[in-house]
């Protein structure tokens, strides 16, 4: 009898170990869409052919609210021909009009870019790839 118990124990441990080693497949080419945050600005579908409506909302109004900075995040939602896993994304590059913040670099589909703004006022920006795309962030106290 003890041999049967040992064999069953070994079999059970082997099955548990095998079940615990599964790794879910991932899709590194198309990350899932990011969760929407309060200070998000979306780059809308078809943005490269638009002007002030390429970013939503535009202008984006945020408040420092007693904090030393407020973070604004752009999300590239300019994906056509499917959803975030099968569609084709247009690349954009968020650039400050006066160099107030560093350019985003190329943002593919669902990519995000965040900037911490520390001073009240208007921050004007555009897409350096599609200069007709323009936007404003207004930071209030």
Give residue spans per PLM region:
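Sec-dependent bacterial lipoprotein signal peptides
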Residues: 1-17
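Extracytoplasmic copper-binding redox domains, predominantly the cupredoxin/blue-copper superfamily
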Residues: 19-141
